[in-house]
Amino acid sequence: MKATLIALLLFVNTAVFAEVLPSTHFKSVQTFVNEMVQTHGFNKSELQFIFSKIQLTKVDKSMQKKTSTGTRSTEKMSWEKYRSIFVTEGRIDKGVIFWQNNKQALENAESKYGVPSAIIVAILGIETNYGKVQGKYPTLKTLIGKAFGTSSRRNFYQKELESFLLLARENTLPPLAIKGSSAGALGYAQFIPSSYRYYAVDFDNDFRVDLFNNTHDAIGSIANYLAEHNWQKDAEIAKVTELDKTQQSFIQEKISKPIKDAQYWRELGLEIDSTINDDVKLAFIRLHDDQSMQTWLTFWNFYAITRYNHDNHYAMAVYQLSEQLKQTFTSTI
């Protein structure tokens, strides 16, 4: 009886602080709807109907503060653990099959954009396991929740919500039916809505850009994305290297854009591979395993991959998976 009473009191107390309401109840949402009508010519009644189907939780600010200060950040996964998730035999085998089934489209993308087939396939493998896992979360609900909830990136997600609604209108997609990742990323390539609108391409010339079902469009769009971020055709991506203790300060823990060229590093006393020209820009990163660390020399194309996902672990997984895919695919020819 005592436990039941305590549970009831907790429920009542929580209800005071958190109230679930249709998103149209919130002034910030109404302001957004009006802006979409005025700026992009949306039908207000249609937007009101769509937004009314999505509920938001109204949270008391004092409770929000207590909740946020009591949350511990998740420790970053080691490179060894990260790699074990994405660079696997299963993902390699499935990737080779995907490559074989889409060989012509991949060759066309490589010819047009200069991005190797292995890199495109690796990104598709890591993002969605070659389209098998595109996300189960209703995208409109995800974006509204982040755009008008307690997210620290509300402005970013309001822009993505705007792009999502425009994307749905431009491609005759039902906003309430679309599903994606928990961050609002969409389709085979996991483009956020703004990237979908800007970088996605109709690669099979069927007059429709479809990243949900069309592998050719996904292939071309990934290649176009990297090309737009200055992918360098036939250039290197990364090389494992070693630095002595006096050179450790050159290593970046976070993403490092290659700014200094090989000549600069050589003049500082670093032994750079003689096959690398003096004018090639380089950076150094460190990847931590549970018991050790790896130092890598990275080139512009490594940085270009981090424009897809801003994480050194991600870029290195793409690179290493691509190397395994290329080796295995070549052996089947």
Task: Map each language-model feature to its residues.
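Cell-wall glycan-active module
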Residues: 1-9, 14-179, 184, 194-333
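Functionally critical loop-and-helix segments that line ligand-binding/catalytic clefts
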Residues: 190
